[in-house]
Amino acid sequence: MAGIKALVALSFSGALGLTFLLLGCALEQFGQYWPMFVLIFYILSPIPNLIARRHADDTESSNACRELAYFLTTGIVVSAYGLPVVLARKAVIQWGAAGLVMAGNCVIFLTILGFFLIFGGGDDFSWEQW
């Protein structure tokens, strides 16, 4: 039952993060849908770690494949935070919309991290807890 509660909490936090993102786009005073491009970063962020977890050997203390995956994931996450700032600096979107998108980024990336911390400990394909 603990797995179900964790899954419900993660889905609620994901919905909250997407609500912040949609508010940053759809409110009447903002009205620009350019910040929706951060959805691409949400989709891309777990992929390097999934690939590295699948192909990495855990016997070494330092693993180049896993460290490259951490580097790529960091670049994707920083890009998700940088896109609204660049759009706001170029006056494509307003700063209020950028703030809402960044709040959504925080919630979504913490949700992704929470998913892998809760459900990712075991084999490469150990999603059987839920």
Swiss-Prot record:
GO process annotations (BP): late endosome to vacuole transport via multivesicular body sorting pathway; negative regulation of growth hormone receptor signaling pathway
Principal localisation: Golgi
Superkingdom of the organism of origin: Eukaryota
Annotated InterPro entries: Vps55/LEPROT
Record localization: Golgi apparatus membrane; Endosome membrane
Entry keywords, A to Z: Endosome, Golgi apparatus, Membrane, Transmembrane, Transmembrane helix
Gene Ontology cellular component terms for the protein in this record: endosome; endosome membrane; Golgi membrane
UniProt KW Amino-acid biosynthesis keyword: no
Recorded topology in the membrane: Multi-pass membrane protein
Transmembrane segments: 7-27, 32-52, 68-88, 99-119
Keyword Transmembrane helix recorded: yes
Similarity section: Belongs to the OB-RGRP/VPS55 family.
Task performed by this protein: Involved in protein trafficking. May be involved in the down-regulation of membrane protein levels.
PANTHER family to which the protein is assigned, alphabetical: LEPTIN RECEPTOR GENE-RELATED PROTEIN, LEPTIN RECEPTOR-RELATED
Protein's recorded name: Leptin receptor gene-related protein
Organism: Danio rerio
